[in-house]
């Protein structure tokens, strides 16, 4: 047995992070040894593979690779045999298994993960946007949003904004209160980008009463007063009519269901709900 420091060459047509994570996870299973990892990203041709394997052979390195182009994978395997190097194909077996399972052909597109990276950062931006422009904190967000949610308190504007943010949708929300005029920005955006949210007064009364109880406050406050709730809902509906936006009655609907309706409206341009 030897405790000689093993060397792993990471060869990838992208950044090589996948193979690096796997290699480090495997090496971590062996205490008392250190592992050298040499990562070579963006390998696109056979000449580059030749150069890498020539260097790897000097250290009798293990080759871990993520190459989606089959021709390059086959070439690497053959050349590695010539040098007596051991190889590990990180992606190939799983791609083949998925193809066998689904009956579909893989695209064999190198560096396709950048698409996922773009989706991830779009989601992060949308989440930060939702937090920044929640509950009418800054009315300028109305002009920047993909969608603006309006409604009285406790109609799920904030959770819906966050849910949509996780879909990459930038959502701002504005509370509608009879004593406070909505920001003028609300009337400057296209009405199809605004969604009105409402609930049946009985349900809203229950939700607000429970909210007060959770906060340790009495249920006699105007916030949970039935007549006050009806007044707020009528006021809000008037604002929604003035804006000319679709209105969703979220009574009895889960957040996911309401969000699905919002997305349908945005993508299909529906006017009446």
Swiss-Prot record:
Organism: Desulfitobacterium hafniense (strain DSM 10664 / DCB-2)
NCBIfam families (UniProt xref): PRK05339.1
Main EC class the enzyme belongs to: transferase
Key word Coiled coil present: no
Catalysed transformations (reactions): N(tele)-phospho-L-histidyl/L-threonyl-[pyruvate, phosphate dikinase] + ADP = N(tele)-phospho-L-histidyl/O-phospho-L-threonyl-[pyruvate, phosphate dikinase] + AMP + H(+); N(tele)-phospho-L-histidyl/O-phospho-L-threonyl-[pyruvate, phosphate dikinase] + phosphate + H(+) = N(tele)-phospho-L-histidyl/L-threonyl-[pyruvate, phosphate dikinase] + diphosphate
Protein name in the entry: Putative pyruvate, phosphate dikinase regulatory protein
Protein role: Bifunctional serine/threonine kinase and phosphorylase involved in the regulation of the pyruvate, phosphate dikinase (PPDK) by catalyzing its phosphorylation/dephosphorylation.
HAMAP family per the UniProt record, alphabetical: PDRP
Family per record: Belongs to the pyruvate, phosphate/water dikinase regulatory protein family. PDRP subfamily.
EC number: 2.7.11.32, 2.7.4.27
Residues holding ADP: 151-158
GO molecular function: ADP binding; ATP binding; phosphotransferase activity, phosphate group as acceptor; protein serine/threonine kinase activity
Keyword annotations from UniProtKB, A to Z: Kinase, Nucleotide-binding, Serine/threonine-protein kinase, Transferase
């Amino acid at each position: 047995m030897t405790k000689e420091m093993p060397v792993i060459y990471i060869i990838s047509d992208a950044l090589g992070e996948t193979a690096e994570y796997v290699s480090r996870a495997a090496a971590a299973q062996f205490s008392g040894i250190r592992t050298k990892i040499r990562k070579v990203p963006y390998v696109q041709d056979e000449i580059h593979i030749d150069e890498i394997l020539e260097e790897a052979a000097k250290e009798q390195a293990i080759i871990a690779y993520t190459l989606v182009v089959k021709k390059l994978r086959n070439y690497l395997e053959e050349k590695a045999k010539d040098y007596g190097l051991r190889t590990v194909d990180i992606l190939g077996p799983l791609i083949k298994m998925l193809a066998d399972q689904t009956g579909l052909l893989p695209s064999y597109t190198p560096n396709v993960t950048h698409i996922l990276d773009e989706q991830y950062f779009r989601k992060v931006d949308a989440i930060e946007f939702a937090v920044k422009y929640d509950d009418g904190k800054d009315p300028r967000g109305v002009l920047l949003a993909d969608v603006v949610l309006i409604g009285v308190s406790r109609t799920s504007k904030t959770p819906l904004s966050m849910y949509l943010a996780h879909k990459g949708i930038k959502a701002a929300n504005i509370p509608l209160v009879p004593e406070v005029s909505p920001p003028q920005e609300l009337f400057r955006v296209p009405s199809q980008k605004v969604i009105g949210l409402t609930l049946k007064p009985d349900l809203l009364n229950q939700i607000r009463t429970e909210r007060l109880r959770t906060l340790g406050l009495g249920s006699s406050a105007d916030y949970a007063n039935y007549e006050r709730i009806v007044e707020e809902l009528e006021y809000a509906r008037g604002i929604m009519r003035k804006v000319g936006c679709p209105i969703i009655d979220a009574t009895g609907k889960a957040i996911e269901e309401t969000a699905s309706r919002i997305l349908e409206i945005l993508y299909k341009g529906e006017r009446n709900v």
